[in-house]
Amino acid sequence: MNQINYLTSERNFLPPTDRDILNLGNNSSNSNNNSSSSNNNNNNNNNNNNNNNNNNNNSNSNSNSNNNNNNNSNNNNSSSSPDHMSLHSNGMDIHHNQQNHHYQNIQHQPHHFQQNYDERRIDYGNNNNNNNTNSMNNSNNNSNNNSNNNSNNNNNNNNNNNNNNNNNNSNNNNNSNNNNFNYNIKQQPQQTLQNQIVNMNGNIITSNGNHHYPTPHMLYARMAEIVEEPLYVNAKQYNRILKRRAARAKLESENKLPKTRKAYQHESRHQHAIRRQRGCGGRFLTKADQAKLDAQNAANAAAAAANPNASSTSTTTSNITNNNNNNNNNNNTNNNNNNNNTNVNGSGGSGGSNKIASSDDDIENDVENDSDSANIKNNSNSPNQSSSSPPPSKSKVVKKSNTINKRNNNINNNNNNNNNNNNEKTQPISSSSSSSSPLLNNGHIQAQQNQSPSSSPSQNLPPLNFSNNINNNINNNGNPTNFNNNNPNNNPNNNNNNNPNNNSFLPPLSNFSNNRS
């Protein structure tokens, strides 16, 4: 929205009449009068500043060319940017020279222009001719522009008329200020409910309904009508929708709806967080897992009580010793433990189900399938095999075991194969053996292996042996210590620097127990 201040010789604001507004830009002779009046103004500047007559003459020629350009642009875009003279085409330009001569002096700069400017708004639309679009500050800078016209012209001449060629806006502003029309245009946010608004075509837009302009509240009302329109469907489509709804309701009641990707991710993330919190390398513990864990703990406690050599202050240590004794006495058990160790350290489990169970029964079924994974691999007629999880192909199993054997051979070349007892203490729970759930010691996992002599020894894999320098035992603080029974400095909490077997310089391996690779 543009704003124009109108000034007469009485220094009062005189808004244009309706006839003047309707005749915007239709008088080309008026624009010519405007150019002649601006030339007179430049002559007045020369009379006031006789010292720079030559420079002023040059600047006058430049300003005349600018005036011509300005007039041409006004004539071309008379509807979008009319000059001031066309608004006062009824002989009012008789006062302009007197007025301009009066305001050449800086002491007579009227300060009430900006304070009492006209509140009327005239909309010229998007003004293609930007020569007349100065800022509001020109009303305050009239004195500077009028008094320093010569200095501005000198600057233009010193710069080889670059300013005149490039900055037509400044010359046009000087012309308007010399005429003292105070022709200040400021872009305003468009308001459609003014009493009288002139658009770029010269049509008057009034708020009394003469011109239907799309005001915001009208648009909002139409949008509300569109939103409230009902959705019409035929009977065939409606019956199809009803059938879909009924089928979905039935699946919801039976808890058989497939989870969306987002829900699946949320539940999977939640269960992984629980596993990390419990330090469990395998799957999430269910009631069946907990029952098997309790039974295993009871058996381990009984075996530890029967064996005086396995006496220890913690339940975890007695369980580990029990496993070691079983390994020494039973080759089948040792092989099974080796298989579990290999699965933990890189085989990726033994093909446990990836689905998120929707109830405890489903989770128990998955647990049973995973606990008998060796039977599923080797014997397709296993009685414990569930029909919901088909056995993997034997070629995949052979490939997996070959990969692990390669890695085990590389490790065994650097280590002692007789380090099985130490290795038994360090392995976290297998992701494939649900019955060998962990014993927790301050949140850290201690190894227990499932003993199932029914599994085929031919598919058992060799153990992963770690370096003798690092036995990777996890003590109560989660730090690696050398757990050598013959070493007197062997306290798991002992971080004595004098102990040559102490590995306190290594980073803590508490995350090792959570390795589910």
Swiss-Prot record:
GO terms for molecular function: DNA binding; DNA-binding transcription factor activity, RNA polymerase II-specific. Component of the NF-Y/HAP transcription factor complex. The NF-Y complex stimulates the transcription of various genes by recognizing and binding to a CCAAT motif in promoters. It is found in: Nucleus. Residues 26-81, 126-183, 304-345, 377-388, 408-423, 448-517 have a biased composition (Low complexity). Disulfide bonds: none annotated. Residues 1-95, 121-183, 252-281, 304-517 are annotated as: Disordered. GO terms for biological process: regulation of DNA-templated transcription; regulation of transcription by RNA polymerase II. It comes from the Eukaryota. Belongs to the NFYA/HAP2 subunit family. Keywords: Activator, DNA-binding, Nucleus, Transcription, Transcription regulation. Residues 262-287 bind DNA. GO terms for cellular component: CCAAT-binding factor complex. This is Nuclear transcription factor Y subunit alpha. A motif (Subunit association domain (SAD)) lies at residues 232-255. Its main location: nucleus. Residues 1-11, 438-447 have a biased composition (Polar residues). Heterotrimeric transcription factor composed of three components, nfyA, nfyB and nfyC. nfyB and nfyC must interact and dimerize for nfyA association and DNA binding. InterPro entries: CCAAT-binding_factor_CS (IPR018362), NFYA (IPR001289). Residues 359-371 have a biased composition (Acidic residues). It comes from Dictyostelium discoideum (Social amoeba). It holds the Pfam family CBFB_NFYA.
